[in-house]
A protein has these predicted regions:
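Glycine-rich and small/hydrophobic secondary-structure elements
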Residues: 63-89, 210-263
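Helix-loop-helix junctions that connect adjacent transmembrane helices in secondary transporters/permeases
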Residues: 111-191
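Beta-strand segments within the central parallel beta-sheet cores of soluble alpha/beta enzyme folds
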Residues: 47-48, 197-203, 231-241, 268-272
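Gly/Pro-rich active-site capping loops and adjacent beta-alpha segments
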Residues: 89-108, 183, 188, 242-272
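Short glycine-rich loop/turn motifs
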Residues: 14, 69, 157-162, 254
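Flexible, low-hydrophobicity surface segments
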Residues: 1-123, 141-144, 229
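Alpha-helical support elements that line or immediately flank enzyme active sites
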Residues: 18-46, 81-100, 161-205, 210-230
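Structural signal for hydrophobic packing residues in well-ordered secondary-structure cores
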Residues: 40, 94-101, 105, 118, ...
């Protein structure tokens, strides 16, 4: 079976590496990428200023920039991209980036979020019956807390995208994704194209488990942008370290519950 990184590519195919934030939360004060751009073998450096369309790779909320502009909101967030003749050149060049940050307070745990009131939005409540009354009348009651750690989608094939520019405004993207249509829409939005200009091909995936529903948007967009701006095929393959850092997770949970039940074990009320 052939996966994205196994596809035979032309010898002029470019390799891409993302420049990532060193802070969980910080203001970008200045960014000098001139030494990166002038490094031998580097073809182009991409930032938010190079995006002709919308600087967003989120599935729908519009809150996940392709490249951070003024604020970084998580460790490892993409700030720029290096397009080079090979991946070794990109790795060496990326170390020459001169970015100055002002570190800001970061919320890193559920407890910190609860203490500071830093939540993403109001809770969604699903209710059936008069649970408070049922709990009050229950003969037996229990309450407690369950803590679940986060999980990483450990697919064997990492996030991967390979893009080629076609005639006129056409762009073809090969990628490992559970959601080719979303990739099509996000690439079109970022490049300022119509959906019919973008063809997405997913022959197979080396695992996904939900981790390739939307997380493939970023590499697909950047590869497509690189191919469009340079006129050469371009590939962005996350190594395992970058995949762990850049992608979202099944996050931690803290579950608080109250349950009322009878002597025979019949549960008559649950609040979670």
């Amino acid at each position: 079976a052939k996966y994205v990184d196994d596809i035979a590519v032309p010898p002029n195919t470019l390799q891409i590496l993302l420049g990532q934030s060193k802070f969980a939360h910080a203001k970008i004060l200045s960014m000098d990428l001139s030494q990166v751009e002038n490094f031998p073998g580097v073809i182009k450096v991409l930032t938010a200023a190079d995006i002709p369309g919308t600087n967003d790779c989120s599935p729908f909320a519009g809150d996940d920039p392709i490249f951070a502009e003024n604020i970084v909101s998580y460790f490892g967030q993409s700030v720029f991209a290096v397009i080079a003749e090979d991946i070794k050149i990109a790795r060496n060049a990326i170390e020459l980036a001169d970015i100055k940050y002002e570190e800001l307070p970061a919320v890193l745990t559920i407890d910190q979020a609860l203490e500071t009131g830093n939540v993403l939005g109001p809770p969604a409540v699903i209710e059936c019956g008069k649970v408070d009354q049922a709990l009050a009348k229950s003969k037996n009651k229990l309450e407690g807390k369950i803590i679940l750690g986060g999980q990483e989608h450990f697919y064997l094939e990492g996030q991967a995208a390979y893009a080629c520019a076609g005639e006129d405004t056409d762009i073809v993207v090969h990628c490992s994704t559970q959601h080719p249509t979303e990739i099509q829409h996000k690439v079109a939005m970022a490049l300022g194209l119509s959906n019919h200009d973008v063809t997405v091909i997913t022959r197979r995936m080396g695992g996904g488990f939900g981790g390739k529903e939307s997380q493939g948007n970023l590499p697909a967009i950047v590869a497509a942008l690189a191919a469009k701006l340079t006129g050469r095929p371009a590939k962005l393959i996350y190594d395992r370290d970058d995949d762990f850092i850049l992608t979202g997770k099944r996050h931690d949970f803290q579950i608080f519950y109250k349950v009322g039940f009878e002597d025979n074990g019949l549960i008559n009320s649950v609040i979670v």
